[in-house]
Amino acid sequence: MQTRITWHGHSNFQVASGGTNVLIDPFFDGNPVAATRWDAIDRPDLVLVTHDHGDHVGQAIDICKATGAKLGCVVGTDARLVEAGLPRELVLNGIGFNIGGTVECAGVRITMTQAYHSSESGVPVGYIVTMPDGFTFYHAGDTGIFSEMELWGRLYAIDLALLPIGGVFTMDPRQAALACSLLRARSVIPMHWGTFPVLEQNTTRFREQLANHAPDCRLFNMTPGESLTLDRSQEGCAC
């Protein structure tokens, strides 16, 4: 079965397979590289927020209210989002969930991981998401590299890693390349770069570092608004 990945720029992705659509960190308004409006995207079944910063929460509340999609987040951030207008009944698991925990929604299994960053509420997190057809991806959120990535790579067969490479606030290209090795990821899409001048402006250094640290991990360079289709049966190759 095929999986379609769309990058809306920054850390904002949609992943769709098996009739299920997952949206992560839906930063549209104020995103200088977003190629579309939040109300013009494919309808998500589930929205995941990695942490409470404006460039990651984005328009999550508006999207969930407009579509009825459930919103997944860490305990603590749920209260802040409800206070901001998210109906409590749209919070996944009622109160959110926590690091190491796994919940299921629309046939999708979501495991929350730690992330090393900051957050206005709760704590920053990442997600390992297994789609209905078994395709598994890891969205790291904003994070520095951490050694426990190796454990997540042992626990889950990660078909695709979505990793920040921008530096300053997150991993830089060298750290992100080593993270691919720790995670044993089959393929990677770099994110959190090029959005603002302070961040890494291209993926050149990441490509060079990936060749050194994880040469078997396939790099997919995407531009905001672009979609690609992966076939899990073809070793993560684009179709």
Curated annotation (Swiss-Prot):
Pfam family, one: Lactamase_B_2
Domain of life of the organism encoding this protein: Bacteria
Keyword Hydrolase set for record: yes
Cited InterPro entries: Metallo-B-lactamas, RibonucZ/Hydroxyglut_hydro, UPF0173, UPF0173_UPF0282_UlaG_hydrolase
SUPFAM superfamilies: Metallo-hydrolase/oxidoreductase (SSF56281)
Record-linked PANTHER family: UPF0173 METAL-DEPENDENT HYDROLASE MJ1163, UPF0173 METAL-DEPENDENT HYDROLASE MJ1163-RELATED
Name under which the protein is recorded: UPF0173 metal-dependent hydrolase Dvul_0081
